[in-house]
């Protein structure tokens, strides 16, 4: 009888010990889970990504952006990164941008070269500069590929944006943000590109043009933030194609706008559709026609839909200017 009582006591002690071990184990598991959760939350807080994925058509672009050094520089400060996404404060003004030239200078030089009041060389720093410009975008097909080509060559360009190309198109808006984020210049190519509205009877309608420019400015501000502004405009069809230029010139001066035309082009909007080799040849011909002293060239191209051959020709066009000793700059 005494032996049975002894066995029962030993059993109770063992059971109690076992329960204590179970409780300790549970406590350790819960503590580990809490600590692990805190570490994950802390790690996630310090690794905010700034990229956006409009849709599958620009996914390859997003992958390249996610691995860029610029993303790494802002990682770890979630409040600052989120602010940049909202107001695109990464878009630099002319004074802040080391890749930009003054729109007033570029506009004056280009105008003088076109109307014969200036002759090469026009720069005072001894450099040879080409300004790659793209009209009518952004497109969801060609603009992302053009951005990738420019990145590969570490070249910056100026994009003359159409308001109707981005209005109501979330993917195009994201591409515009990405264009600015990669350090390119954003300029105004009016909202509508409608010749009959802008130039009735082939005469510049100042009120309609200013209204169209301001409408485009408002749309771009909605996308890029209220701090965004651009002084650079380009008239659809160019400035010199229309009557009524005197009144338009006065309106531009009053509003602080600078029109920048072009003095070379790849002819991707001229005549029959051209392949990449023909676009390269057109570029060379229009550049060579400027003469051996040409030191400031504004090259017209397009990044809208249907300009896939422009994308294909762009690497060769960049290499052509590199071989001739040109520097690539933007216009702000």
Predicted feature residues:
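N-terminal pre-catalytic segment of deacetylase/amide-hydrolase enzymes
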Residues: 2-10, 19-132, 139-144, 152, ...
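Short, Lys/Arg-enriched phosphate-binding patches
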Residues: 16
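A sequence-composition feature that detects small, non-aromatic residues
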Residues: 27, 33, 40, 100-107, ...
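Hydrophobic alpha-helical membrane context
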Residues: 29-30, 147, 201, 314
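Active-site beta->alpha N-cap acidic-glycine motif
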Residues: 94-204, 215-231
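Catalytic domains of cell-wall/extracellular-matrix polysaccharide-remodeling enzymes
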Residues: 171, 193-300, 304-322, 326-327, ...
């Amino acid at each position: 009888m005494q032996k049975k009582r002894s066995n029962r006591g030993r059993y109770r002690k063992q059971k109690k010990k076992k329960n204590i071990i179970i409780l300790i184990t549970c406590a350790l598991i819960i503590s580990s889970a809490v600590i692990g959760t805190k570490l994950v939350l802390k790690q996630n807080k310090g690794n905010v990504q700034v990229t956006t994925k409009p849709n599958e058509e620009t996914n390859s672009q997003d992958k390249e952006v996610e691995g860029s050094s610029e993303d790494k520089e802002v990682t770890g400060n979630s409040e600052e990164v989120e602010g940049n996404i909202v107001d695109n404060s990464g878009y630099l003004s002319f004074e802040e941008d080391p890749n930009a030239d003054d729109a007033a200078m570029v506009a004056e030089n280009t105008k003088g070269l076109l109307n014969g009041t200036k002759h090469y060389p026009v720069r005072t720093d001894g450099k040879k500069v080409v300004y790659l410009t793209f009209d009518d975008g952004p497109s969801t097909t060609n603009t992302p590929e053009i951005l990738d080509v420019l990145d590969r060559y570490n070249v910056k360009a100026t994009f003359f944006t159409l308001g109707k190309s981005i209005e109501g198109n979330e993917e195009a808006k994201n591409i515009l943000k990405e264009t600015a984020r990669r350090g390119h210049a954003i300029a105004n190519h009016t909202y509508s590109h409608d010749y009959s509205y802008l130039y009735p009877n082939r005469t510049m309608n100042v009120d309609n043009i200013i209204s169209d420019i301001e409408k485009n400015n408002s749309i771009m501000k909605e996308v890029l933030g209220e701090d965004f502004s651009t002084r650079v405009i380009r008239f659809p069809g160019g400035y010199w194609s229309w009557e009524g230029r005197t009144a338009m010139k006065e309106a531009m001066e009053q509003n602080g706008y600078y029109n920048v035309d072009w003095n070379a082009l790849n002819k991707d909007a001229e005549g029959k559709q051209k392949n990449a080799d023909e676009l390269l040849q057109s570029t060379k011909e229009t550049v060579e026609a400027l003469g051996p002293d040409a030191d400031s060239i504004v090259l017209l191209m397009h990044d809208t839909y249907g300009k896939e051959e422009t994308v294909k020709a762009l690497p060769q066009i960049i290499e052509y200017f590199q071989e001739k000793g040109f520097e690539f700059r933007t216009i702000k």
